[in-house]
């Protein structure tokens, strides 16, 4: 098999949540443990950081990887989903896994996989863990795929666990209350391993506290002592932060939600410092070194790690075009605020969703005065463009329906004046289709 054929095999022969939804979700870690045993427990060969939560875990994971790279570590990064190419999921120092490694891994292990009937994510996780060992990484940042307790990344014992926040998503699998979802996410808390919680509320905080106490895990709530005291959004993109103890630092990632992600990140860096992975800041020389690494890491996250789709400016002007992967109510509560702040003559929104989200909840958050281009991503779970158009009309949102993201985007470009603004989003797959079109 060549690389494309190998990807098709993975997408079609292994149950894939991104394409099939809940029917591809496997409860239990039996397959994961069997794969881990087969490959000789590769994740034990390097340090790991485990990042879960509903929203923000991708940005936090990539930011951590960028800072650790700047500190001189060889850093593995495992995230999902990919937007354009499967290899985005598995990176070392920003470089995607090679096509040849993907092909060789699948071809050499196919006979072992097929009797197990593993899911796509089980195979991909095993590939990532083995690749990081084979390539001798120092540390790997591992993003949870879905939930936490039963996620197949949850066989690692990390240096620190991170849970960014909790909101409603995948409720058919994780539970229909915030407390139930938090309990699933809290499943990544390991005995004696520090855990940082980015955001919590009266419903979720007791869940985290109880689990941490049960596991004798030191717990830090980032909200209790926020490090980011100011965030200035720069016209050209990115954010200028004022951080307690460190002063002003420029971050390259856009998005009104990024200050919360950075607030989550700072206590994680403190844990890594305490464990000797980062320079201690008590001495002037160390403080200067750490500040440089922090500035360089946060200032070049996208460049160092390949992160895309987070308030990404894909066309800077005439008209300006931005895309974002926000896909649930929690994400859109932030995106709607950001869209309200955009200065333009008319806003054009290319929009599509998948069918297992709270579609009405998201539609209610969208700006009523925008012109809409409803579309369907190239994904089996995507809502049909006409159905979405009709559902949106009940929320006072009006526009035409287009069968592909490319056609919707081209229509928006034709209609938009120089001083208009175009936004593309609603799901990761819509953004992925856009980036494929642009590439």
Model-derived segments and their meaning:
Residues 1-53, 60-62, 66-71:
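Short functional linear segments
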Residues 22-29, 33-44, 70-156, 172-174, ...:
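ATP-dependent carboxylate-amine ligase catalytic core
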Residues 78, 194-199, 349-351, 370-378:
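Short internal beta-strands
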Residues 81, 124-173, 205-248:
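Extended acidic/charged loop-beta regions that coordinate divalent cations
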Residues 134-135, 139-144, 152-162, 166-170, ...:
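Nucleotide phosphate-binding/pyrophosphate-handling subdomain across enzymes
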Residues 182-191:
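Membrane-proximal helix-turn-helix segments that form the acceptor-binding/catalytic region
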Residues 201-220, 320-323, 360-421:
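C-terminal helical cap/extension that packs against the catalytic core
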Residues 428-439:
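Glycine/aspartate-rich loop-and-adjacent alpha/beta segment that forms the canonical ThDP
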